[in-house]
Amino acid sequence: MMGPQGTGGLVVAPGVEIRPLKTGGTGVQSYRREQPEEYPTRLESGTLNGHGIAGLSAAVDFLNEITPAAIHAHETALMSAFYQKVSALPGVTVYGDFAHERAPIVTLNIGDMDSGEAAEILSDDYGIAVRSGAHCAPRMHEALGTVAQGAVRFSFGWFNTMEEAETAADAVRDIAL
């Protein structure tokens, strides 16, 4: 949601009993050994993440102002422009189904270059941050035959520009040639 990590919410139907896995002190009843029974303090051990809550609130305000539809359209346009350029490059293998709706992510390999090496070149020579390796998806890499090489993942977001997407595609072209 564009807010800080480590902040979230919990929606529970009336009558559902929740017992915390771990408990700790509360600022409400500091001398009690047991967690309070009343909600929400029963689930709020320790100090609340005030900064995270404020950041999450700002993220919600931002999303309400910009709208998720506008963000989706922007990210999709960036991803599509990047994909159109890199998918036509000789020696570049792009993974995934781009004929249907998808997340604004393009995963690829450049020839037989190790994905970590490609990511390092993109970072050092072009100032482009990507993710390389197995992406916590070892079975997918087994299916693709990319276990040893990994893959390079480009992720596009609201704060990226079309110029950045085109620059990234040009960098892939330069490395591939």
Language model features: what each stretch is:
Residues 1-177:
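Pyridoxal 5′-phosphate
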